Every structure is written in structure tokens, then in C-alpha cells.
Amino acid sequence: EVKASKKWDHEQVVELITKVNNYWQANNKPEVRAFWDNAAYHTGNMEVYKMLKDQKMLDYSIRWAEHNDWTGATEANPAKWKYKPYGEGKQHVLFGDWQICFQTYIDLYNIEAAKGNAAASEYMVKRAKEVMHYEAYSEPTDYWWWSDALYMVMPVMTKMYKLTGDTKYLDKLYDNLLTTDEIMLDKETNLYFRDGKY
């Protein structure tokens, strides 16, 4: 039997989350790229903001989004967009490591839209809409060929559905997930391998 060494109350948990998040923000500037290694933090920071309503935390993610012009990978020509093999360049627009940033951009947009600023804030989700619409209406279903993509892009698809009302995002999520299951899901353990190479 596993027992926790300490019972935490709500205030203690909030205090610890605040302490850790404040430390992170004090020691890491937000002016960094929108790739997964930075973007994953912002998905958590947005959840902390939703819980605590601390404007300083929200401002940190806004500065990061503004630094990246509300984009992921920046290639403008869809004919040059790719998602494999692995790459960190501007042409990897369809690669989930460059799409996780859209989770935060959509969250930031929704905050503004709730204040009645939807039209004035459309720039926040313009690139997300462009990229994810393209992907949702494309034929491939093997976009998520490594397990991290499930955390990175599945939420983007559900957020895009909620943002637009277009069920194609849910259809694409389902189709992509079926392919992911085929290439990575271990049927005995019901756990995912790291990627399709295993």
C-alpha cells in the first residue's frame, strides 16, 4: 500500500504551485521560440492562470506569444509544409512540436473573446486556424507518429473544434488517433511506445 508522506490542503498546493511558477518565470525569459520545449510550459502556465487568475502569469504567456508573432513554424507556402522526418525548421509547420503553441494562443484568444474582444483579437488565432484547417482537411493520418504528439496536438484539435464549431477537427483527431494506435500502442499493456520505431 502506498501512502503519501504528507497530506496537502488546498492552500498549500496553491502556495507550492505559485512558488514554483514564480521561480520559473523569474529565471526564464519568455522571449524564446514557440517549439515544444518552451510551449509545453505555457500550456501549464495557462492552467495555473485559470486557477489563480494571476495577471502576471498571463502576461508572461502573452509576452511569449507576441515574441513569436502568434505562430509556430513560419513557412508561408503550404506546398513546403511538412511533418516528417523530425525537424525544427520553419517548414515543419505540420509537425506537432510546432503546433503545441496553438493551445496557448487559443486560450489567450478565448480570454479576450470572453471580454467582448473577439474580432480585435483574431490575429491571435489566425495562424492556428490556417495551419490546423489545412491539416484537418488533408488526407494523411500519420501526423502523430510519436507519443508526445498526443499531448501536443490532440488538445489543439478539440480547441479548434470549440473555436470554430467545425466537426472536421474531431474527425481528424479520431483518424489520427487510430493511426497512432496502430503504430505505437502495445496491445498487451495498453501503453504507448515512444514512437513507431519500437
Label for each model-derived stretch:
Residues E11-E31, D59-K82, A119-T141, T167-F193:
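Long, well-ordered core segments of solenoidal/helical folds
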Residues V2-K6, A40-Q55, I100-N117, M152-D166:
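Well-ordered alpha-helical scaffold segments within catalytic/enzyme domains
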Residues K80-G87, Q91-T158:
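Extracytoplasmic mature domains of secreted/periplasmic and thylakoid-lumen proteins
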Residues D9-H10, T18-M46, K50, D54, ...:
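Solvent-exposed loop and edge beta-strand segments that line ligand/cofactor-binding
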